[in-house]
Amino acid sequence: MALGFLVYLSYTPRIKGNIPAFTPETYPIIGSYKFFTHKLSFWKAAQRASKNGMFSFWLGKNHVVGVSGEAARKMYLENPAMDHIKGVILIGHGPDYIDGRKTKQHGIWLPVMAGNKSYAQKNVLNCQKTAELTKRLPKVTNDVRKAFESVASQGFIINPARMCAVLTWDTATRVFAADELIDVPENRAKLLYYLPILQKTSSCHLLSFPWASYFSLPYWKRKYGREGMRRLVTPIVEARMRIIDPVRADDPLQTFVDNGDSADYMINFLISMIFISAANGCVVSGAMLYSIAHHPELQEKIYQEIKAAANQYAADSSAPLVDQLDSLPVKAWENMSETIDLCYKECIRMWVAFPMGRMNEGTTDIKIPGTDEVVPAGGLCCYNTIDVHYSEKLYPEPLKWDPARFGEGRKEMEQEAHGFMGWGAGRHPCNGIRWAKIQQNMMLAYAFAMYKWTGCHKDGSPNTDFIPPTTALNELAPSLPQNLFLKAEPRK
């Protein structure tokens, strides 16, 4: 017993400063393992047990401060010492190497470009300029149209989660990467094999067991997924750099090559951005189609808004609606439907709710507003968006799918700073928001222009039971909704 106690003391570091009290759900050696396995219940229990909504917990030898409430949320999002790249170690999924000790941060993420931007941030923003998106529209609209035309070959019954996820990956890859990854069937098959591995595999548990890296299946799966993506994109980048033919490709990768970017930076950008650009969109897109299909009044309202936008912007307003969509400019896709925008915010609020990671990279402690407690220098800090997105005050009946809460006359979330965090907030807003909204508008526009949708079972029999999009709240990594099916009725 004495030996075990000495081992425990030697394993647990001393923390200086007036930190929040430790949550009762802390166990020797492993720490608060329910942070991984029961994200929602762990967070709520820790809040209830704390005196002010702030608490400490261990993940192995890693001390983490959990914060909640408006003032702490504002500090978390706006303090310049809170680094989101170094804090990603608390997330545990995606293509970046995380072994439980540190995240290996590539140079594409360092803020060394003009305006304190990173190479990755600069390219993401450039890819979404109107001139660039205009060049991508013909291929991405063709991808979306072909995908929904294929619904007929599936007996007009689809799993919206799977179909929309694939479409999200396809179109995001065109906008931020290279056409060969989608146009060459072998490349696309590999892409659609590796991306789900990276999407749903979390090695966050290695924070508690860093010594177990080489015995961890998720750790090796993430390395396998990352290496697979590297082997996929590297030959494409290298081939582009050798081409001197005046007839050149016209996609983002070619722009990077023409700019003289290094192969290493381009390869790492493609690997990371193909994943990141669709990480949440691939989950939310299917939830959007599913949710609206179960609300026929919203579906009809959106259909009418799509028709109005097409009539205003299409090259030939007398053409069939789906043909009108093929000719729409970027401006039309950005202003497609106010109702879609409300639904999008509600789906994001309900589905994209998860712990966020930051590291206090400063040399001094950060005081938590409204308390005498601190986030220690060099320490990890976590905020779970369920604190705001499932707040009874900001979102009455938070488990109810209610897009109207974002409309005029409601907007209860505006009572507090950063009351909606669906697009990031503070110092780190989402850089890909423009494309994300266009992409979602595009998928739903073609879906509703071509069909009326209703809920069904796998065999096509009617199913009017609506399952609000809350099932991912306890999962280690975002995953696609399961066992949801829709039936499409072609519009006349």
Curated annotation (Swiss-Prot):
EC assignment: 1.14.13.-
EC class of the enzyme, as a word: oxidoreductase
Keyword Transcription regulation: no
Keywords in alphabetical order: Glycoprotein, Heme, Iron, Membrane, Metal-binding, Monooxygenase, Oxidoreductase, Transmembrane, Transmembrane helix
GO biological process, one term: sterol metabolic process
A single Gene Ontology CC term: membrane
Transmembrane segments: 269-293
Glycosylation sites: N116, N335
Primary residence: membrane
Coiled-coil regions listed: none
Record membrane topology: Single-pass membrane protein
Chain residues that bind heme: C430
One of the Pfam families matching this protein, by short name: p450
Gene Ontology terms for molecular function: heme binding; iron ion binding; monooxygenase activity; oxidoreductase activity, acting on paired donors, with incorporation or reduction of molecular oxygen
Pathway: Secondary metabolite biosynthesis
Intracellular or extracellular location(s): Membrane
Reported induction: Expression is positively regulated by the cluster-specific transcription factor MYCFIDRAFT_198930 and is up-regulated during banana leaves infection.
Cofactor(s) needed: heme
Chain's role: Cytochrome P450 monooxygenase; part of the gene cluster that mediates the biosynthesis of an emodin derivative that may be involved in black Sigatoka disease of banana. The pathway begins with the synthesis of atrochrysone thioester by the polyketide synthase PKS8-1. The atrochrysone carboxyl ACP thioesterase MYCFIDRAFT_190111 then breaks the thioester bond and releases the atrochrysone carboxylic acid from PKS8-1.
Family in the record: Belongs to the cytochrome P450 family.
Protein name: Cytochrome P450 monooxygenase MYCFIDRAFT_204672
